[in-house]
């Protein structure tokens, strides 16, 4: 059981780091695509930076609730 708990804590740490990354990216202060993959933008204006796993919902503005699970793995323009 302790092993599962450690795994759970690591997952939560990773999510919190992603939330921090997304928050900085939406404010324009994060380095581009650190640990992410680039996907071409359909509009031709550069690309979007996505996590390799999880959700790929685009964020158009800073969400009021930064603890929202949708931010744990998201794409950012």
Curated annotation (Swiss-Prot):
The protein's name: Putative uncharacterized protein encoded by LINC03041
Organism: Homo sapiens (Human)
InterPro entries, sorted: DUF5540
